[in-house]
Each structure stands twice: as C-alpha cells, then as structure tokens.
C-alpha cells in the first residue's frame, strides 16, 4: 500500500499588492472552522477532480469547495485549476441559496487577472 500523492497543490491568489484575500479570510475564522475547511481542501488536493457534494462547478474553469462550519454556517471557496495548481480565488460565508453575484464576479475578476499575468 503506497502513500497517496497530491494531484493538485494549493496556492492562494494574490493581488498585485500582495493581498491574499482567502488567506486573510481564513485567519478570521475559529480554529475549528479553519480545520474543517482545511480538511475539505486537502480532500480536493488528493482526489481532484471531485464532484458534489464537496465540489461544484460554477462556470468555465471555476469551481467551489463547499464546507460546513460551526453554527450551521456554510462557506464557499471559489477556485480555478491551472495545470497542477488549485488557486484559491475568493472565499465567503454563504447566506442565501444562490452564490451572490458580487462574490462570483470577484472570483472571475481574479481569474482574468491570472490569465493576463501568464
């Protein structure tokens, strides 16, 4: 029985000013919530590609990791995959059944910024 290998490595999207929104967002969560999200991201790292209920495709090259936090809160981390890199673009606590347009647009803007930097 061999050691399971990562299929994708995680990287935080950084703006031109070096701001990593997802990393900063994670720091504000409780240790338990960070662990839940970390476990879910690790599952994606080792099992990519995955589908529901953990990962849902939102748009072309854009997916979300769906995590349950304490107090029945739900978080979403929007990401893209470039080669063997899973790039975490945007994160938020979900408050409605649909992904808010503003959060979706933020992730898409970060994704196009990555494309321009290539």
Label for each model-derived stretch:
Residues 76-80:
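Short, surface-exposed beta-strand/loop micro-motifs that present aromatic residues
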Residues 1-73, 83-85, 93-118:
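Basic, Lys/Arg-enriched alpha-helical interface segments
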